Amino acid sequence: MARIAGVNIPTAKRVPIALTYITGIGPASAKAICEAVNIDATRRVNELSDAEVLAIREHIDATYTVEGDLRREVQMNIKRLMDLGCYRGLRHRRNLPVRGQRTHTNARTRKGPAKAIAGKKK
């Protein structure tokens, strides 16, 4: 198993598919990485030499924010919004949808399980 950005990527899969196992790298980024380091997208990870794996690793480290650093950056952005007290920050603080979705009905994923209210029946 090749280890890139702290993630053991599967060896039997094609290189672009295997790279998507790294948080912060999607299909488009994975294809761009393969093109940047001149690796054919149809090759499998177990066919790569150590030098090619090293080239992928160095390209990702130099170009992309991935894994723990990406998670930390996202959390810091959310914390910044909450500290500012802006509308989006308030929605995060109250665990409500942030992007304008309706909440009168629906939004159960974000709000959690429905809470029973005594005397609500007609």
From Swiss-Prot:
UniProt keyword annotations, A-Z: Ribonucleoprotein, Ribosomal protein, RNA-binding, rRNA-binding, tRNA-binding
Q: Which GO terms describe its biological process?
A: translation
Region annotated Disordered, chain positions: 98-122
Q: InterPro entries annotated for this entry?
A: Rbsml_uS13_C, Ribosomal_uS13, Ribosomal_uS13-like_H2TH, Ribosomal_uS13_bac-type, Ribosomal_uS13_CS
Q: Which Pfam families match?
A: Ribosomal_S13
Q: What SUPFAM superfamilies does the record tag this protein with?
A: S13-like H2TH domain (SSF46946)
Q: Is Ribonucleoprotein among this UniProt entry's keywords? A: yes
> Which molecular function terms from Gene Ontology are attached?
rRNA binding; structural constituent of ribosome; tRNA binding
Gene Ontology CC terms: cytosol; small ribosomal subunit
Which PANTHER family is this protein grouped with? 30S RIBOSOMAL PROTEIN S13/40S RIBOSOMAL PROTEIN S18, SMALL RIBOSOMAL SUBUNIT PROTEIN US13M
Question: Subunit structure, per the record?
Answer: Part of the 30S ribosomal subunit. Forms a loose heterodimer with protein S19. Forms two bridges to the 50S subunit in the 70S ribosome.
Q: Which family does it belong to?
A: Belongs to the universal ribosomal protein uS13 family.
Q: What does this protein do?
A: Located at the top of the head of the 30S subunit, it contacts several helices of the 16S rRNA. In the 70S ribosome it contacts the 23S rRNA (bridge B1a) and protein L5 of the 50S subunit (bridge B1b), connecting the 2 subunits; these bridges are implicated in subunit movement. Contacts the tRNAs in the A and P-sites.
Q: Which NCBIfam families match?
A: uS13_bact
Name of the protein this chain belongs to? Small ribosomal subunit protein uS13
**What is the species listed in this Swiss-Prot or TrEMBL entry?**
Ruegeria sp. (strain TM1040) (Silicibacter sp.)
